[in-house]
UniProtKB/Swiss-Prot annotation:
Catalysis performed (reactions): tRNA(Lys) + L-lysine + ATP = L-lysyl-tRNA(Lys) + AMP + diphosphate
Molecular-function GO terms, alphabetical: ATP binding; lysine-tRNA ligase activity; magnesium ion binding; tRNA binding
Domain of life: Bacteria
The protein, known as: Lysine--tRNA ligase
SUPFAM superfamilies cross-referenced by the UniProt entry: Class II aaRS and biotin synthetases (SSF55681), Nucleic acid-binding proteins (SSF50249)
High-level lineage: Bacteria, Pseudomonadati, Pseudomonadota, Gammaproteobacteria, Lysobacterales
KW tRNA-binding (keyword) present: no
Organism of derivation: Xanthomonas oryzae pv. oryzae (strain MAFF 311018)
Length: 505
């Protein structure tokens, strides 16, 4: 049974405020105008602030002489009633603007305004002016209440200070936390920039199934579901890889997909059960070209969205401009563990002794490749601050990657690490159907041995490879982690609009 967390109870004073607001809504219902829907907005606060930013040019007289009138709507964020005249501030998706309200101009609407609450959504029409303090203001000639807010917003000085409440009530967080809105605006721009970059290079965006008969494309535990009409168990996809490579077989030589993946794993500052990935495949490319592509798309996206390639992330200053370092996994392990020799890197017994010395817990089924990876993750990964490609992973931990022509037991694979976090994974794709079938069989044996993240045997994918897949390079970039990097966010929950949370009671 899912553990439930008690829902936070509003304080008594908040309950009384809600009751007061409900009474106001009741009065509006009595007038038959509770939630009007006949207002069409024509202007945005941010656009006006930008257009009339120069106070020396746009003096009060110049604004009045311009004859400019505006028609706006937004959430009431502040109000100051001073008798015959009042000030208010409204917020829309683009920013905020001040309203100057006069009783002798607005009449009954001004009287009604005095009873409105912060959080209400209002519409305003009027000309533009500038106050003595230089603030651009809308001199209202008409004012309406569009939506009555029943719940008070958090205190403006403290905002939504409870982090868990911010994630659960993202709708409130977005209202009161400008920094949160900016993160998600940047997220949208990042994805849009990456799409434009790929489209300009003849990549074709495609959509592949979210529900799979056989889970595959990554070593991960899947979520299961059931199709009632067909009486068929299905799996939410852990990766789109095998479907995308089927498309390469079919002649779509440059394809990509930006979409959700689902993995039935733990939750942390770096992991969410559902997450967004960019996955792409390019025929006639090796993992060297895919590393070049990875480096360039990340660098160009940063420049496009941020205007710089220098970012700060979780206490580290990252420079995306220089060429990213490329470092073999076994060499990185030996560099950080001088006790491990070159011969040890492929010697299972030797690696077992090193794991014991390093207090790394392992399973009896692990071969030398998995042991080498465990040592890398424990002793090297967290040290990789500046962008670094770790290359040439063991076959054992790379069931879909092409084997190296020169290094038996290794593959033409890379992972990109920045500030100790994996952002991308790619390789020259395995297109030998017999080798792929043998690796699937090894994964099945691992699953039978208790590895619930091991892959299933996908006979249809083997059949596709038997028609012939050209030499191909592939890449997966974690969009959520890339957004974390480019926005300086330290938790994946800060870049997901609605992160996974235990349900409230």
């Amino acid at each position: 049974m899912t553990e439930q967390i008690p829902a936070p109870q509003p304080p008594a004073d908040e309950n009384s405020l809600i009751a007061e607001r409900r009474a106001k809504l009741g009065a509006l219902r009595g007038q038959g105008i509770a939630y009007p829907n006949d207002f069409v907005r024509e202007h945005f606060a941010g656009d006006l602030q930008a257009e009339f930013a120069d106070a020396d040019t746009w003096t009060p007289d110049a604004l009045e002489a311009s004859g400019r009138t505006v028609k706006m709507a937004g959430r009431l964020m502040a109000k100051r009633v001073m008798g015959k005249a009042s000030f208010a501030q409204i917020q829309d998706e683009s920013g905020r603007v001040q309203l100057f309200l006069q009783g002798n101009v607005l009449g009954d609407a001004y009287t009604a305004f005095k009873g409105w609450d912060v959080g209400d959504i209002v519409a305003v029409e009027g000309g533009l002016t500038r106050t003595k303090t230089g603030e651009l203001s809308v001199k209202a000639s008409a004012l309406r209440l569009l939506t009555k807010s029943l719940r008070p917003l958090p205190d403006k000085w403290h905002g939504l200070s409870d982090v868990e409440q911010r994630y659960r009530q993202r709708y409130v967080d977005l209202i009161v936390t400008p920094e949160a809105r900016e993160v998600f605006i940047k997220r949208s721009k990042i994805i849009r920039a990456m799409r434009a970059w790929l489209d300009a290079r003849r990549f074709l965006e495609v959509e592949t199934p979210m529900m799979h008969y056989i889970p595959g494309g990554a070593t991960a535990k899947p979520f299961t579901t059931h199709h009632n009409a067909l009486d068929l168990d299905l799996y939410l996809r852990v990766a789109p890889e095998l479907y995308l490579k089927r498309l390469v077989v079919g002649g779509l030589e440059r394809v990509y997909e930006i979409n959700r993946n689902f993995r039935n794993e733990g939750v942390s500052t770096r992991h969410n059960p559902e997450f967004t990935m960019l996955e792409l495949y390019e025929a006639y490319a090796t993992y060297h070209e895919i590393m070049d592509l990875t480096e360039q798309v990340i660098r160009d996206t940063a420049q496009s969205v941020l205007g710089t390639t220098q970012v700060s992330w979780d206490g580290a200053d990252i420079d995306l401009a220089p060429a990213f370092r490329r470092w073999r996994m076994d060499e990185a392990v030996r560099h950080h563990n001088p006790e491990i020799s070159a011969a040890d890197c492929t010697d299972r017994d030797a690696l077992l002794r090193h794991c014991e010395r390093l207090k790394i817990r392992v399973k009896p089924s692990y071969g030398w490749g998995k042991l080498l990876l465990e040592i890398f993750e424990a002793t090297v990964e967290h040290t990789l601050v500046q962008p670094t490609f770790i290359t040439d992973h063991p076959v054992e931990v790379s069931p879909l990657a092409r084997s190296s022509d020169t290094e038996p037991g290794y593959t033409d694979r890379f992972e990109l690490f920045i500030n100790g976090k994996e952002l991308a994974n790619g390789f020259s794709e395995l297109n030998d159907p017999e080798d792929q079938a043998a690796r699937f069989q090894a994964q099945v044996q691992a699953k039978d041995g208790g590895d619930d993240e091991a892959m299933h045997f996908d006979a249809d994918y083997i059949r596709a490879l038997e028609y012939g897949m050209p030499p191909t390079g592939g890449l997966g970039i974690g969009i959520d982690r890339l957004v974390m990097l480019l926005t300086g966010s330290t938790s994946i929950r800060d870049v997901l609009l609605f992160p996974y949370m235990r349900p409230e009671a």
